[in-house]
Amino acid sequence: MKERTIQPVNNGLNGNITIPGDKSISHRAVMFGAIAEGKTTIKGFLPGADCLSTISCFKEMGVDIVQNGDEVTVVGKGLEGLQEPKAVLDVGNSGTTIRLMSGILANTPFFSCVQGDASIAKRPMKRVTNPLKQMGANIDGREEGTFTPLTIRGGDLKAIEYTSPVASAQVKSAILLAGLRAEGVTAVTEPHISRDHTERMLEAFGVKVTREGKTVKLAGGQKLTATDVQVPGDVSSAAFFLVAGAIIPNSKLVLENVGMNPTRTGIIDVLEKMGATFTVEPINEGASEPAANITIETSSLKGIEIGGDIIPRLIDEIPVIALAATQAEGITVIKDAHELKVKETNRIDTVVAELTKLGARIEATDDGMIIYGKSVLKGNTVNSYGDHRIGMMLAIAGCLAEGKTTIEDAEAVGVSYPTFFEELQKLAK
């Protein structure tokens, strides 16, 4: 278990930073390339542990994939060309891999067994396995398919019209991917619109997808045609530096190539509402996944209320939004965020516990947290508990705290941002 010591940043964070590739888009580019016909080249791929797990699983199913840094070539097998894996498919720490891949495996006529690490073993799979079973897939797991390992015997599926109890891009994507080889039109309706990378990328690969309000539909029997994918920077990774630029005194940062998919930019809306000073310069208008350069500088923030439809657009950014709120004048209330409980950790509990250790005034609620600003943070020993987003949030907090902060289990950040600590060090000079 590796530790990292963070010293206070006295002269602010300054400079330009190119944000690494979007994790959600990198996963999908590899998966869709694997089931497409032809060769897909991916540029800007995120070579973090989670996305490498996706590559490894599809290689196990006979797909020819060559990865060189942030460039990946996938020679697709088509929807019917995947081979039965001889070994267990290991997704590591990646919830995206297991949930989306389950949709693909559900319609593939062979047997597979899928498992992950200790964190994956605690995450609920029934939200995906139940609708896939309704389509006709034969899936089992611990506690009737609630937890991994999962065994999947795929085959002929029937389309369903599914109303999801949660706004989850992973649930929606698994059902749509299963629907590619199902008989009929598959439809998924959500309580709020979740991130739409799957829909955008399926369209880029030649699949006709229909969107009507909170419902997404596709007809079975459509083929994917290989296409080249340019992955923009991950706004969830950018969020840590956006908040750092806003709350650490004497800072000015330019974040280059940040993905600006409107289903993901809740963090931008929240920072604007809190009073942050920043500019957004679009750089690839017309692309299926928009991107921009963002300049942000030290700002006076104020507390706000965050809840409702915006939550699915910033669910992964809530840990660092909570940190921003500790430096805002007044009270910030985060609600409707039950999904935080089923992430890599229960993020309501871990955010509250670890920020409290640093001197923040913050309390947990059933569906979020209440943060009382403005707090003076003081260095302490804290723990990521193996959660990459908690680890990065604590590192930014450490830059601001008085005295040194030691982060236990700091290597967890490599899941989504392998160069995070090096970038932070560079900007602090």
UniProtKB/Swiss-Prot annotation:
Phosphoenolpyruvate binds at residues 23, 95, 123, 170, 347, 389. Monomer. 3-phosphoshikimate binds at residues 23-24, 28, 168, 170, 316, 343. GO terms for biological process: amino acid biosynthetic process; aromatic amino acid family biosynthetic process; chorismate biosynthetic process. It catalyses: 3-phosphoshikimate + phosphoenolpyruvate = 5-O-(1-carboxyvinyl)-3-phosphoshikimate + phosphate. Pathway: Metabolic intermediate biosynthesis; chorismate biosynthesis; chorismate from D-erythrose 4-phosphate and phosphoenolpyruvate: step 6/7. Gene3D superfamilies: Enolpyruvate transferase domain (3.65.10.10). The active site is at residue 316. This is 3-phosphoshikimate 1-carboxyvinyltransferase. Its main location: cytoplasm. One of its GO terms (molecular function) is 3-phosphoshikimate 1-carboxyvinyltransferase activity. It is found in: Cytoplasm. PANTHER family: AROM/DEHYDROQUINATE SYNTHASE, PENTAFUNCTIONAL AROM POLYPEPTIDE. Its EC number is 2.5.1.19. Pfam families: EPSP_synthase. Belongs to the EPSP synthase family. Keywords: Amino-acid biosynthesis, Aromatic amino acid biosynthesis, Cytoplasm, Transferase. One of its GO terms (cellular component) is cytoplasm. Catalyzes the transfer of the enolpyruvyl moiety of phosphoenolpyruvate (PEP) to the 5-hydroxyl of shikimate-3-phosphate (S3P) to produce enolpyruvyl shikimate-3-phosphate and inorganic phosphate.
